[in-house]
């Protein structure tokens, strides 16, 4: 008994799937089961096997990789139309389907692994070659723009945004009113429906991959910005109280310890926050009044000569 791996695709229903997968030489006990009877027993064995559902899922996953988006509902409809697994197994048992033995188990396992590997190869092929096609179209657009001076998307209002789902269609609208030609003798430039679906699908997958790759970093950056904003913002009207004191003592904006104690009571801030606010405020206003800066520095040195005054900023 020998199972072979056909080149064509696995069918959607159990009977045709079994007919296309194993070699007709399979029969109970390993003997020759040619003819219609042997084929029916073989179908029943595959349909009743525990790995049949997994094999069907792997096959459908391969079909989905390169199927245009607008054609995916047809696959879903075919899957929904097939009988439930329990009904299929009951029908196989009623037909006298054999278990298949170790050779059928090995075949089903290898076929599932083969389809999973094939799916990965298909995904890689679609991504690489589709991106090459997209880049080729982009280079053609750039060459056309350099020749004509007209932007391909000019007048369409197309923008890149997360909520835009029909960018490919908006780009195709450039050729509305034409017969598919570019109007300059360069031949047809419009993509077919399948090509547009493929480009849209690749673009959507790449955008999702980029989002997932940078999502955590973007969230961390946003949280850091918000944290700094919260840390640098004084609560309530405390800033107004400090600014009022600053305006009243603009000639000498250095509060004494008693002044700081009163400001702590009035604002509810900590002494460190009061000190930091005045340090930053003096830095912001250092160059606003250069004429009096020399006088302020001289007066400050006289006051802090005993070494017990505020630290210089």
From Swiss-Prot:
Known CDD domains for this protein? homeodomain
Highest taxon of the source?
Eukaryota
Q: Tell me the protein's name.
A: Homeobox protein knotted-1-like 2
Give the CC-aspect GO terms.
nucleus
Per UniProt, the keywords (alphabetical) are: DNA-binding, Homeobox, Nucleus
Q: Which PANTHER family does the entry mention?
A: HOMEOBOX PROTEIN TRANSCRIPTION FACTORS
State where composition is biased (Gly residues).
28-38
Q: Where is this protein localized, as stated in its record?
A: Nucleus
Compositional bias of kind Low complexity: 14-27
Tell me what organism the protein belongs to.
Oryza sativa subsp. japonica (Rice)
By sequence similarity, the record places it as follows: Belongs to the TALE/KNOX homeobox family.
The cross-references to InterPro entries, in alphabetical order and at most eight, read:
ELK_dom, HD, Homeodomain-like_sf, KN_HD, KNOX1, KNOX2, TALE_homeobox
Q: Which residues bind DNA?
A: 226-289
Q: Name one GO biological process term.
A: regulation of DNA-templated transcription
Q: Which residues form the ELK domain?
A: 205-225
Record GO terms (molecular function): DNA binding
Known tissue expression: Isoform 1 is expressed in roots, leaf blades, leaf sheaths and flowers. Isoform 2 is expressed in leaf blades, leaf sheaths and flowers.
State the residue spans of region: Disordered.
Answer: 13-40, 282-313
The chain's coiled-coil residues are: none
| The gene coding this protein | HOS58
């Amino acid at each position: 008994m020998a199972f072979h791996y056909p080149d064509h695709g696995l069918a959607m229903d159990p009977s045709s799937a079994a007919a296309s997968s194993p070699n007709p030489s399979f029969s109970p006990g390993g003997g020759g089961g040619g003819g219609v009877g042997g084929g029916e027993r073989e179908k029943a064995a595959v349909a009743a096997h525990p790995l049949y559902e997994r094999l069907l899922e792997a096959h459908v996953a391969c079909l989905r990789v390169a199927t245009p988006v607008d054609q995916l509902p047809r696959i879903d409809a075919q899957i929904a139309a097939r009988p439930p697994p329990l009904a299929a197994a009951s029908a196989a048992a009623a037909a006298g389907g054999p278990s298949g033995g170790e050779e059928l188990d090995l075949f089903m396992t290898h076929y599932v692994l083969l389809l999973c590997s094939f799916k990965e190869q298909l995904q890689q092929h679609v991504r690489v070659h589709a991106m090459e096609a997209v880049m080729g179209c982009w280079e053609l657009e750039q060459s056309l723009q350099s020749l004509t001076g007209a932007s391909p998307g000019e007048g369409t209002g197309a923008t890149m945004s997360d909520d835009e789902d029909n960018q490919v269609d908006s780009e195709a609208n450039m050729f509305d009113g034409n017969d598919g030609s570019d109007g300059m003798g360069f031949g047809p430039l419009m993509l077919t429906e399948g090509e547009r679906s493929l480009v849209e699908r690749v673009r959507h997958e790449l955008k999702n991959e980029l989002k997932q790759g940078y999502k955590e970093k973007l969230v961390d950056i946003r949280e850091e910005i918000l944290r700094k904003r919260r840390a640098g913002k004084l609560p309530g009207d405390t800033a107004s109280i400090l600014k009022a004191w600053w305006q009243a003592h603009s000639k000498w904006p250095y509060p004494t310890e008693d002044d700081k104690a009163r400001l702590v009571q009035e604002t509810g801030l900590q002494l460190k926050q009061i000190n930091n606010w005045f340090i930053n405020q003096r830095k912001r206003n250092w160059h606003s009044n250069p004429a009096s800066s020399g006088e302020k520095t001289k007066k400050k040195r006289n006051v802090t000569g005993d070494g017990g005054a505020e630290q210089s900023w």
